[in-house]
Amino acid sequence: MQCMNWNKLTEKGSVEVMEQEEKRKAVEALLADCSEEHLWACIVAFQGEPLRTMSGLPYSYTLKEGKHGGLTKELWVDRRENSKSITWSSVRMAFQNVLKMKESLSEGEKPYVKRPKALGDIRGISYIYPLFDRFGLIETDPDKNGKNGIQLCLQLEEASVHNEAEANTEGETT
């Protein structure tokens, strides 16, 4: 019986480590090359991740599978009983605005975006804004001490190492 529980813990830990690694790699790729392909990889990797709007409302999003087995380019925000959809075109529009903001900045600098509407009058922007913050595309709070982008990657890496170490010691007896 103990072996079965250990296997489940190890399997769960491995899945979590793989998910964290996928998120880390997606963010690193996006920050190295701000392309729509890398943005989409981040969107896919972070689905189901607990997020908060600027006003503090919790939400997460999922991507649904299309007719031919691929993911649809529509984010389904799960905040209440009814889900709200955000189209890929809305995400792209906001992303293009971020890229325009970056043009006037020095290399590696992120645009400071005080409020979601500063990215444009785009449907679903209050849900897109925290995503861009989480991915490290924008700076939303100068006093945040870097809890996004590369810093998030490092935190995810640290968490996966910790989870791996925990999973390896849970089966040991003292």
Give the label of every model feature segment.
Residues N5-E36, V161-T174:
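Non-catalytic accessory regions used for complex assembly or targeting
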Residues E19-T87:
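Long, low-complexity, charged/polar intrinsically disordered regions in eukaryotic proteins
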Residues T87-G120:
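Short acidic, hydrophobic short linear motifs in intrinsically disordered regions
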Residues Y112-K114, F135, Q151:
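Extracellular-facing segments of soluble proteins and assemblies that are Gly/Ser/Thr-biased and enriched
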Residues L119-R134:
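Short amphipathic alpha-helical interaction segments
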Residues D133-K144:
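A short, conserved structural fragment
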Residues K144-E172:
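Short, cationic-aromatic polyanion-contact patches
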